[in-house]
């Protein structure tokens, strides 16, 4: 009986975490001074994107290959009908 309770608790926690993760998306719209470096100097745009990162070389003195940031999805509106 104890194993079933533990199993149910683990299942509930896993489902809760997965639903929270689905509520977020990532964006490459990051202020240049807030970028967290994701690559080494000289990384190409394709190498950067292969790592799952963003590439923007339009601003000097900041990382060109950087991690995207998570943004919350707006809550879905319920259909009134």
Swiss-Prot record:
<feature type="signal peptide">
    <location>
        <begin position="1"/>
        <end position="23"/>
    </location>
</feature>
<dbReference type="GO" id="GO:0030277">
    <property type="term" value="P:maintenance of gastrointestinal epithelium"/>
</dbReference>
<keyword id="KW-1015">Disulfide bond</keyword>
<keyword id="KW-0339">Growth factor</keyword>
<dbReference type="InterPro" id="IPR044913">
    <property type="entry name" value="P_trefoil_dom_sf"/>
</dbReference>
<dbReference type="InterPro" id="IPR017994">
    <property type="entry name" value="P_trefoil_chordata"/>
</dbReference>
<dbReference type="Pfam" id="PF00088">
    <property type="entry name" value="Trefoil"/>
</dbReference>
<feature type="disulfide bond">
    <location>
        <begin position="38"/>
        <end position="53"/>
    </location>
</feature>
<feature type="domain" description="P-type">
    <location>
        <begin position="26"/>
        <end position="69"/>
    </location>
</feature>
<dbReference type="InterPro" id="IPR017957">
    <property type="entry name" value="P_trefoil_CS"/>
</dbReference>
<feature type="disulfide bond">
    <location>
        <begin position="28"/>
        <end position="54"/>
    </location>
</feature>
<keyword id="KW-0732">Signal</keyword>
<dbReference type="InterPro" id="IPR000519">
    <property type="entry name" value="P_trefoil_dom"/>
</dbReference>
<keyword id="KW-0964">Secreted</keyword>
<comment type="function">
    <text>Stabilizer of the mucous gel overlying the gastrointestinal mucosa that provides a physical barrier against various noxious agents.</text>
</comment>
<dbReference type="GO" id="GO:0008083">
    <property type="term" value="F:growth factor activity"/>
</dbReference>
<protein>
    <recommendedName>
        <fullName>Trefoil factor 1</fullName>
    </recommendedName>
</protein>
<dbReference type="GO" id="GO:0005615">
    <property type="term" value="C:extracellular space"/>
</dbReference>
<feature type="disulfide bond">
    <location>
        <begin position="48"/>
        <end position="65"/>
    </location>
</feature>
